[in-house]
UniProtKB/Swiss-Prot annotation:
Biological role: Possible tumor suppressor which may play a role in cell growth.
Protein name per UniProt: Transmembrane protein 184C
GO cellular component labels: membrane
Residue spans of biased composition, Basic and acidic residues class: 425-438
Residues passing through the membrane, by range: 17-37, 48-68, 86-106, 179-199, 212-232, 254-274, 287-307
Signal sequence region: none
Pfam families linked: Solute_trans_a
Name of the gene: TMEM184C
Annotated organism of origin: Pongo abelii
UniProt-listed InterPro entries: Ostalpha/TMEM184C (IPR005178)
Length: 438
């Protein structure tokens, strides 16, 4: 059924509606907070919670406005879907920390959910980069194979380098994906250990579970960020149109700062800077450390929201002829089928590697040609030169996708690859047919 006139013009009224809803929520929330302050004794804990709430009220509208603008101008789903997921990190972090600051007893549960979303953000940032590259450069593997060999960064510089091409692409994606598996697993283990009374968060001791889980999470997180950095280093030139440095710093700083400041606070507890002499309204020193971490995050997320507003701007995706209903854009934001397919693909590839089966080739080779000769062939060089010489957008859009991507018409990398593959096979058949005729 076609949309009515009201729904067809949803872009005109959705933003004022959201602004009105937010103002109403402010009118309701502020008196409740004031009433809460009058009901309780105003101590350090309550003051910290109230100040954090002010930053929360400043953070959420900035983040939600950028998310809403992406939904209004939802013209390139393969790029904007991971961006929207990344933008949700700031309000989730801020709201989660504010709740944990108010109710320290449930801090372990809400904080672990926040940390799981952290892994989800790193995965989506990698997905954003790969989606852009595979759409603009369907022959990405050939481009990688034509590049000079990239060595590992310190401290892995002694390890043998990953082969340029499909191997490097697969291992970088797998290195990021492993963190999205390790982090939820360690989160579940942390919850179980908390119920058993052996977690002891914030206390560096090899007699509790928290220390071991921190080490595991840290190693997994560092390797995921290392794979992201290596991926960017190799494809720096191809990624330059989307200005990935600012985006990478936003993701990296939020993830690393939140993690390492928790480690620093735990060290302050260990050396006695934060001691039982000053716990204020908190029951234990560990609760003070957790509350301090949550309070700092509420302030940091306000700065992160401003940074995200500029680095993940919606403006490059504004198109003159926009299509799609509000329901399509809103539902697409919650669609996780791409993640399911990606995880299934990586699991199958790891399984084939473990069983010793050969990897599936994205680009078939002739039996009489090896990797070196195929890269030197004219067809490969033409494909690389064509992909590298695509003109930039005169309107500032990210182009090279063949046509404007809308929720109704979304090109897939597989279709583009099939077209290139069929053209290549057709070119190979023509000389053989001529030789037979002669």
């Amino acid at each position: 059924m076609p949309c009515t006139c009201t729904w067809r013009n949803w872009r005109q009224w959705i933003r004022p509606l959201v602004a009105v809803i937010y103002l109403v929520s402010i009118v309701v929330a502020v008196p409740l907070c004031v009433w809460e302050l009058q009901k309780l004794e105003v101590g350090i804990h309550t003051k910290a919670w109230f100040i954090a709430g002010i930053f929360l009220l400043l953070t959420i509208p900035i983040s939600l406005w950028v998310i809403l603008q992406h939904l209004v101008h939802y013209t390139q789903p393969e790029l904007q879907k991971p961006i929207i997921r990344i933008l949700w990190m700031v309000p989730i972090y801020s709201l989660d920390s504010w709740i944990a600051l108010k109710y320290p007893g449930i801090a372990i549960y809400v904080d672990t959910c926040r940390e799981c979303y952290e892994a989800y953000v790193i995965y989506n940032f990698m997905g954003f980069l790969t989606n852009y590259l595979t759409n603009r450069y369907p022959n990405l593997v050939l481009i990688l194979e034509a590049k000079d060999q990239q060595k590992h960064f310190p401290p892995l510089c002694c390890c043998p380098p990953w082969a340029m091409g499909e191997v490097l692409l697969f291992r970088c994606k797998l290195g990021v994906l492993q963190y999205t598996v390790v982090r939820p697993f360690t989160t579940i283990v942390a919850l179980i250990c908390e119920l058993l009374g052996i977690y002891d968060e914030g206390n560096f001791s090899f007699s509790n579970a928290w220390t071991y889980l921190v080490i595991i999470n840290n190693m997994s997180q560092l390797f995921a960020m290392y794979c992201l950095l290596l991926f960017y280093k190799v494809l720096k030139e191809e990624l330059s149109p989307i200005q990935p440095v600012g985006k990478f710093l936003c993701v990296k700083l939020v993830v690393f700062v939140s993690f390492w400041q928790a480690v620093v606070i735990a060290l302050l507890v260990k050396v006695g800077v934060i001691s039982e002499k000053h716990t204020w309204e908190w029951q234990t020193v560990e609760a003070v450390a957790t509350g301090l971490q949550d309070f700092i995050i509420c302030i940091e997320m306000f700065l992160a929201a401003i940074a995200h507003h500029y680095t993940f701007s919606y403006k490059p995706y504004v198109q003159e002829a926009e299509e799609g209903s509000c329901f399509d854009s809103f539902l697409a934001m919650w669609d996780v089928s791409d993640i399911r397919d990606d995880i299934s693909e990586q699991v199958r590839r790891v399984g084939r590697t473990v069983r010793g089966h050969p990897r599936k080739k994205l680009f078939p080779e002739d039996q009489d040609q090896n990797e070196h000769t195929s890269l030197l062939s004219s067809s490969s060089q033409d494909a690389i030169s064509i992909a590298s010489s695509m003109p930039p957008s005169p309107m500032g859009h990210y182009q090279g996708f063949g046509h404007t991507v809308t929720p109704q018409t979304t090109p897939t990398t597989a279709k583009i690859s099939d077209e290139i593959l069929s053209d290549t096979i057709g070119e190979k058949k023509e000389p053989s047919d001529k030789s037979v005729d002669s």
